[in-house]
Regions:
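NTP/phosphate- and nucleic-acid-binding module
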Residues: 1-73, 77-90, 97-650
Length: 650
């Protein structure tokens, strides 16, 4: 048989060979570092036997698929250790994930001390180096095997597999687990690992199921790489918006109010207000939008017309019972059906289009409680939502305009290089989820694809991520832990106008159906705030800071002058306060620095006599004395231009 390798070279063998044996034939060093293989594009164990002409790639830890095999094996070592220490624990699932692995167990919550004990047991397992064996069982035998081991979650997983599925197991010493693999040949290479956290996780991500205990870990081939990763994890914890946002008193959550319902405290609310006012002025004054204000709820009849009732009802908060109540209401998950009636309020001609509507909308989504997280996954949120009613011939220009507006906003926030673009398409194998036929989806997807290509925007395509009514551009960003969220969407909808009988009068006096573009300039303000907290580690650009200047009198004698300075700052629209406490000036400066304020103005006898202020900033440290008018002029220009100044180490 002929084996074609990744570098284009070929190896010829007279008999079947395992992937590991082929790796050894190529190089002993390659065999030592091998984690798995790819045969004709399929990732397999090193123990897999190749018996015919094939393309082969030997995967090491440097390959993504190699890392997955390495860390998946580590998750089994974790499970083996847990079962030794907690025999009553029930196994759920334990996949490899980006930068690590986790395993879910039905067991009591764990402490850091518990994780340390499990780590110690994992080291014992690795030292024992039990042989790893893969084998398969028929469906009924597999179910009986897991029932005998009293593993109900594994039984459920097997029962849910397709009838023709291959059911494989991995055995290492005294531990056996249901698993598709692939795994390492041996656990011996797993020497640099760490259990990083534990948390609750619902079985299969469904809040109606039992809460399990999830243990997270990471593993590397080299101790130095592990230490670097752990150092990085400590650093990103300092940026985690869910921790830092609370420390900075930007938001909080309260159990009695509920999950996914954060309270924006005065500082956080001020940042969001600044963002909202900026976006509203931008849309209204520079991009030709008209503003609407529509209800937070509507009768179910509206959502039946829009399609939400059939395609999105499970994600909505419904008020009332369809069977018993005469009128059933639902909180709005989006604003589009309301704005359609704003459009329909007066007849429009072809000259009136595009008709661009925008609203700062409060929306409600019935997210699973297991999905709730800080400000990024919430049940009530505010969004810069808008809908453009356009003629078909305006599609290209208006899609480009929406994309340019979104990119401009990202640029002002300084995050344009932190995003990726995705063309979210329908799933042709699950057509009941969507409106429209094959031709509709191919046409609309092509329209969006052409815009992205024409604008030179690098993008990926994702099947099954479209809205039920049309494809979209999703602008994606990752949080500090690498989880991707959608920040901004631009969606093309060529079907909904018929549902709402929307039309315009063309140049011949005939009625024509318009298209609709659903879009946001900023996306969800709460999610944007979370993103900015993590991007800037709480050190926001001055124009976004809820407190831009703090005036610090060096003693009570200069409190009146400090108040005069503060009054002048406020007159010029600067967000400023005075620290009139009797603390020492050094303490006040340190505290202001810890609170990440952009500017401190120190005032004492010299400043009072000359009408000046001593300026300290995050950007240049001690900037010396300045005339108050000059400082005000400079900071007002910085705020007006939304400048992002570089920080200096202090």
């Amino acid at each position: 048989m002929i084996i074609r390798l990744k570098d284009g070279s070929e190896k010829e063998y007279a008999q079947p060979m395992s992937v590991l044996d082929i790796a050894k034939d190529i190089s002993e060093g390659l065999a030592r570092n091998a984690c798995a293989g790819q045969v004709n594009g399929e990732t397999v164990d090193l123990r897999t036997v190749v018996s015919e002409d094939s393309d082969l790639n030997i995967l090491t830890f440097n390959d993504d698929e190699g890392k997955l095999a390495f860390r998946h094996t580590a998750s089994h070592v974790l499970a083996q250790a847990v079962k030794r220490l907690y025999p009553e624990a029930k196994l759920a699932i334990g996949p490899a994930i980006a930068e690590g692995f986790y395993y879910d167990f039905d067991m009591a919550p764990l402490t850091r001390e518990d994780l340390d004990a499990i780590e110690k047991e994992m080291k014992k397992v690795i030292k024992e180096n039990p042989p790893i064996e893969r084998y398969e069982l028929p469906r009924e035998e597999a179910i009986a095997f897991m029932k005998e081991k009293e593993e109900p979650y594994k039984v459920e997983l097997i029962e849910d597999l397709p009838e023709d599925a291959t059911i494989s197991f991995y055995k290492q010493g005294d531990f056996t687990d249901l698993c598709a693999g692939p795994h390492l040949i041996s656990v011996k290479p797993i020497k640099a690992f760490k259990l990083t956290a534990s948390s609750g996780a619902y079985w299969r991500g469904n809040e109606n199921n039992k809460m399990l205990t999830r243990i997270y870990g990471t593993a590397y081939t080299k101790k130095a790489d592990l230490e670097e990763r752990l150092k990085y994890l400590e650093e990103i914890k300092l940026r985690d918006h869910n921790r830092l946002g609370r420390e900075m008193e930007l938001f909080t959550t309260v159990d009695v109010i509920g999950q996914g319902l954060p309270l924006l405290l005065p500082k956080g609310a001020k940042i969001v207000q600044t963002l909202q006012r900026w976006i509203e002025d931008l849309e209204d004054n520079e991009w030709g939008y008209v503003r609407t204000k529509t209800p937070l709820m509507a009768k179910s009849d509206l959502y039946k017309i829009s399609g939400h009732w059939d395609h999105y009802k499970d994600g909505m908060f419904v008020l009332g019972d369809e069977e018993n109540d005469k009128e059933v209401l639902a909180l709005r998950p989006m604003t589009c059906p309301f704005q359609y009636y704003c459009y329909k309020n007066t007849q429009k001609s072809y000259r009136d289009l595009p008709y661009r509507m925008s609203e700062t909308s409060t929306l409600f989504r019935n997210e699973d409680s297991g999905e709730m997280h800080g400000l990024t996954r919430v049940r009530q949120f505010t969004i810069s939502e808008g809908h453009l009613i356009i003629r078909p011939d305006q599609t290209n220009d208006e899609l480009k305009g929406c994309l340019h507006l979104a990119q401009y906003c990202l640029g002002v926030l300084g995050v344009q290089d932190d995003v990726t673009y995705r063309l979210s398409k329908w799933d042709p194998n699950n057509k009941e989820k969507y409106l429209g036929d094959d031709e509709y989806w191919e046409t609309t997807q092509d329209a969006i694809r052409n815009i992205l290509v024409e604008q030179g925007v690098p993008f990926v395509e994702a099947e099954g991520e479209a809205a039920f009514y049309g494809p979209k551009i999703d602008i994606q960003a990752k949080n500090v832990y690498g989880k991707e969220d959608t920040m901004i969407t631009i969606q093309l909808d060529c079907a909904i106008a018929e549902n709402f009988d929307m039309y315009y009068i063309d140049q011949n006096g005939d009625k024509q159906r318009p298209y609709v573009i659903h879009r946001t300039s900023m996306g969800c303000y709460e999610r944007t705030l979370a993103w900015l907290i993590e991007k800037y580690a709480g050190k926001f650009p001055t124009w976004l800071c809820p407190e831009q200047v703090r005036v610090l009198p060096i003693s009570e004698k200069f409190a009146d002058y400090a108040e005069e300075v503060n009054k002048e700052l406020k007159k010029n629209g600067i967000l400023s306060t005075v620290d009139n406490r009797s603390e020492k000036i050094g303490y006040k400066i340190r505290e202001a620095r810890l609170q990440k304020l952009p500017y401190m103005l120190v005032v004492g006898a010299q400043e009072q006599e000359t009408g000046k202020v001593s300026v300290r900033s995050r950007f240049a440290g001690d900037e010396g004395q300045k005339d108050l008018k000059d400082f005000i002029s400079a900071i007002c220009e910085e705020i007006r231009t939304k400048e992002i100044r570089q920080e200096v180490e202090q």
